[in-house]
């Protein structure tokens, strides 16, 4: 176990904003990152960027002071998922996720893999229903539950397995906080400031609505990364959230 970057070496942020980095070019990504302040947000690195640029890219972001949500959505046999989660913890990321549909044994193995890391372990979050999915998509998979009901079933399994929370849509947040309690973390993509295009997300909310619904961490992508002044956009979002708190 070799932690690459301890939490004490990074900037502390109280912002619930996690900016999704979706770049094809490493230099473009770092150019954007150098325009923003790690006190204003955390960063999400997904499958495309991690596949292109690897762990070293994560380290470069950490060296700039950012906490990293490694969004790789591990979904495999329990032993493989556990080793993958431990590797993410070795990298020193702030948060990592798995697919809840991988089942109880997989999620339990992933949680147990983080025990040796103690207080340095990342938050372990499970994905319920992707925000791009609608009821018709679930029907195609042979499921008769609505996206909301299926997400709640997976969230209940996640909590039973001892994980820290789930990725869910903002529409589910109010219900989930009531059912699973305030300590169960909710991470929500599809968050877009007023006036932003919906893009490929189907179930979206503004940051203020998400905060009111009980979302703990809100993932925002293109409204920040494609802004002409991303630093100011982040400050405006955070200011609006402080006013709404």
Curated annotation (Swiss-Prot):
GO BP terms, alphabetized = 'de novo' pyrimidine nucleobase biosynthetic process; 'de novo' UMP biosynthetic process
Pfam families hit by this protein = OMPdecase
Q: Pathway involvement?
A: Pyrimidine metabolism; UMP biosynthesis via de novo pathway; UMP from orotate: step 2/2
Q: Which GO terms describe its cellular component?
A: cytosol
Its Gene Ontology molecular function terms? orotidine-5'-phosphate decarboxylase activity
Q: Where does substrate bind?
A: 22, 44, 71-80, 131, 192, 201, 221-222
Coiled coil regions in record:
none
Record field: catalytic activity: orotidine 5'-phosphate + H(+) = UMP + CO2
Instruction: Report which superkingdom the organism of origin falls in.
Output: Bacteria
SMART domains reported in the protein's UniProt record: OMPdecase
Q: What is its EC number?
A: 4.1.1.23
Keyword Lyase (UniProt): yes
Keywords from UniProt, A to Z, are: Decarboxylase, Lyase, Pyrimidine biosynthesis
> Which residues of this protein are catalytic?
73 (proton donor)
Among CDD domains, the record links this protein to: OMP_decarboxylase_like
Q: Quaternary structure?
A: Homodimer.
Alphabetized NCBIfam families for the sequence: PRK00230.1, pyrF
UniProt cross-references to HAMAP family, sorted A to Z: OMPdecase_type1_B
UniProt lists the family membership as follows: Belongs to the OMP decarboxylase family. Type 1 subfamily.
Q: What does this protein do?
A: Catalyzes the decarboxylation of orotidine 5'-monophosphate (OMP) to uridine 5'-monophosphate (UMP).
What is the recorded name of this protein?
A: Orotidine 5'-phosphate decarboxylase
Q: Which organism is it from?
A: Escherichia coli (strain 55989 / EAEC)
Lineage start: Bacteria, Pseudomonadati, Pseudomonadota, Gammaproteobacteria, Enterobacterales
